[in-house]
Amino acid sequence: MINFSSFYQHIAQDERLFHWLDTLPAQLSEWRAHALHGHFASWERMLENLPEITPTELNLKQGVIANKTPALSTGEQLGLTNILKALMPWRKGPFSLYGVNIDTEWRSDWKWDRVLPHLSPLKGRLVLDVGCGSGYHMWRMLGEGADFVVGIDPTQLFLCQFEAVRKLLGNDQRAHLIPVGIEQMPELNAFDTVFSMGVLYHRRSPLDHLWQLKNQLVSGGELVLESLVIDGDEFQCLIPGERYAQMRNVYFIPSAKMLKVWLEKCGFKDVRIVDENVTSLEEQRKTDWMVTDSLEAFLDPLDHTKTVEGYPAPKRAILIATKP
């Protein structure tokens, strides 16, 4: 059964994080007692069925890659594949685990390649990843030398996927996924780097989200913000109707320049737009590990520069900012 005792033990010994123990255990007890997904028990059984494997080769620098010598047999690989496929859909990755290649909907490694050149070095840093999904980028952060990585995401399938990968990486305790939203966190002012990637446009109040991110950073800490944007000057913002690219919960899509103004309005300094990129059909697509509709189905079939609703097709910007 998934439990958070190792995380509690770690933060109890960390003066930057131990105040979180005032609220978190009660929140997670309430979550387990009253808020579990209907499939959660079956997902946990899949975790219990995973083999105990210690990698002899672990590469978190070029990807999330684990291998062992001797290699798994064909039958063992098939058994591992079947367990991991019971945790579908896999959206963020990819993962290469003992010959089983999880080809996720998103090529999250491509996003990481766009982000990485602009980061302050992560070596030795305490990192928070907000809306971390199944945790792909958390492992890449460790690959860049982060000391400890906390991911938060309330989606329970993502928690189970993260715990599956963790078990297959030798039960690595340097990263933990906590199933809460940022609005449930106290203002810790603790993290050296905070990532929020693919979250802002799902927020009814985007400036409140930026303040919440700021309140998790130490003074001098770095925010890495990635979000949907539109073309235009600092006065341009799209407020979609009921759906955007078939997503219901999209509220504000500013231009990158407006997003920079928002960050400055919230008191961040040294705000810079470091990347803008139109999402390609190669970066987000249907795979054997995510078999429902993906980006291609969300775009106008006659004009891929538009969504099916007629809005500009998804474009994403990365901004870096510093808390004074």
UniProtKB/Swiss-Prot annotation:
One of its GO terms (biological process) is tRNA wobble uridine modification. Its EC number is 2.5.1.-. SUPFAM superfamilies: S-adenosyl-L-methionine-dependent methyltransferases. It comes from the Bacteria. Keywords: Transferase, tRNA processing. It catalyses: carboxy-S-adenosyl-L-methionine + 5-hydroxyuridine(34) in tRNA = 5-carboxymethoxyuridine(34) in tRNA + S-adenosyl-L-homocysteine + H(+). The keyword tRNA processing applies. Carboxy-S-adenosyl-L-methionine binds at residues 92, 106, 111, 131, 153-155, 182-183, 197, 201, 316. Pfam families: Methyltransf_9. Catalyzes carboxymethyl transfer from carboxy-S-adenosyl-L-methionine (Cx-SAM) to 5-hydroxyuridine (ho5U) to form 5-carboxymethoxyuridine (cmo5U) at position 34 in tRNAs. PANTHER family: METHYLTRANSFERASE, TRNA U34 CARBOXYMETHYLTRANSFERASE. Belongs to the class I-like SAM-binding methyltransferase superfamily. CmoB family. This is tRNA U34 carboxymethyltransferase. It comes from Proteus mirabilis (strain HI4320). The lineage of its organism: Bacteria, Pseudomonadati, Pseudomonadota, Gammaproteobacteria, Enterobacterales. The gene is cmoB.
